From Swiss-Prot:
Entry's Gene Ontology molecular function annotations: identical protein binding; thioredoxin peroxidase activity
Record flagged with keyword Transferase: no
Primary location: cytoplasm
Listed name of the protein: Peroxiredoxin-1
UniProt keyword Acetylation, yes or no: yes
N6-succinyllysine sites (modified residues): K35
Record's note on what induces expression: Up-regulated in hearts from hiberbating bats.
BP term (GO), one: regulation of stress-activated MAPK cascade
Regions of compositional bias (Basic and acidic residues) in chain numbering: 184-199
Pfam families: 1-cysPrx_C (PF10417), AhpC-TSA (PF00578)
Catalytic residue positions: C52
A GO term from the CC aspect: nucleus
Amino acid sequence: MSSGNAKIGHPAPNFKATAVMPDGQFKDISLSDYKGKYVVFFFYPLDFTFVCPTEIIAFSDRAEEFKKINCQVIGASVDSHFCHLAWINTPKKQGGLGPMNIPLVSDPKRTIAQDYGVLKADEGISFRGLFIIDDKGILRQITVNDLPVGRSVDETLRLVQAFQFTDKHGEVCPAGWKPGSDTIKPDVQKSKEYFSKQK
């Protein structure tokens, strides 16, 4: 599967953009700054909307879990960094984000969204794209939701853990795999060890 210039198994498109960092400061960051770490890079349509804060807060609240497995979560939308900051400074009870534990990237020229294939051109906003990029900068997973439905932090965390497991051990992860579950040796004979345990 490919999406814009984002192709599974290929280097993820690099970007350089201004982000609002967890300390509330503006900083120019690029994807290459995170080489050596896994990255969950997700797009959302707009600041000050309805589903978006639920997703962003959910990822931010669990940023430490991702950090523990050497993974950085980064959010992005087409809004300006000033708009991001205003939303962060708006209380949660008023639809704001409150303090963030993840950077929020500003993509006002829509070049990053276009590069990653998530730009909804007729509205100039991003679909809910999510990209898992490994520690070598290779794109491993793409999901894109239409605007009305949010994403699962649990599933994203599971996918990062599964890719990290396969990278380290060379075994493959069956459907619904979670850390500690059985994996499959990718060999006709050795795979029977896994399948023989199935009901």
